[in-house]
Amino acid sequence: MIRRRCRLGLSSLLALACAVPAAAQTDRWEKDIAAFEAADRISAPPKGEIVFVGSSTIRFWDLANAFPDLKTINRGFGGSEMADSTRFVDRIVVPYSPRIVVVYAGDNDIMYTPSEEIVIQFERFVRAVHAKLPDTKILYIGIKPSLLRWAQVDRVRLANAMIRQFCERDDRLGFVDTDNAVLGWDEKPRKELYVSDGLHLTPLGYQILNALVRPYLVPAPAPAAAPAASSASR
């Protein structure tokens, strides 16, 4: 009995230890999420448009200048991981009922998280969004190779490949390949696309990202109507 009680006690402690990181992560981002909500109360963003979520690549993205003809909402919070966007999906996605959600996350996971786990976290994000918004399209921007994390490039590419395969199984999902777009003649990341930290993008880097993403955001033009037959041809 004593041994059993000890085992139960240890199990309880382990469960508590596992629960702490999730709560700590929620607390870590609470100020950022609360700031979004406060801004919404002052000026409510439009519904049914495009929401961008994810880490600092999203946060630093000047969406208004990148897509002046589109209505976009930036809900990026720097340093976040894929699981964080899922954790707050009811506060940073669902309230806006977007037609498209653009996701960039995984840069901060890749150092310590297996590629397979990043894919699982993205799948959870998709399920969380579609549970409330089944018609919303989700566009995942592939994790970009970077100078800072070039040593992890194989893990980046594995995660991207698996997420692409997942997206190909659902018409509501899309995948943007960033790999070739940021590499130079030597097949390494082009230095001019990254700021001094070797991770975040320069304005030129964002120009490339804009060009990659835009085709997925702009509705396809309606097919032209067939010309009416002239009286001479009747």
Q: Which residues are covered by each model-predicted region?
A:
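A structural preference for short, hydrophobic beta-strand core positions in alpha/beta folds
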Residues: 74, 140, 175-177
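Cell-envelope and extracellular/periplasmic
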Residues: 76-78, 102-111, 123, 130, ...
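Catalytic His-Asp segment of secreted/periplasmic serine-dependent ester chemistry enzymes
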Residues: 147-234
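Short, well-ordered coil loops that connect the C-terminus of an alpha-helix to the N-terminus
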Residues: 20, 69, 135, 169-172, ...
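Conserved SGNH/GDSL esterase-like catalytic core that processes O-acyl groups on lipids
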Residues: 25-124, 147-157, 161
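N-terminal secretory targeting modules
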Residues: 1-51, 63-66, 218-234
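Charged, glycine-enriched surface loops/patches
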Residues: 119-141, 158-173
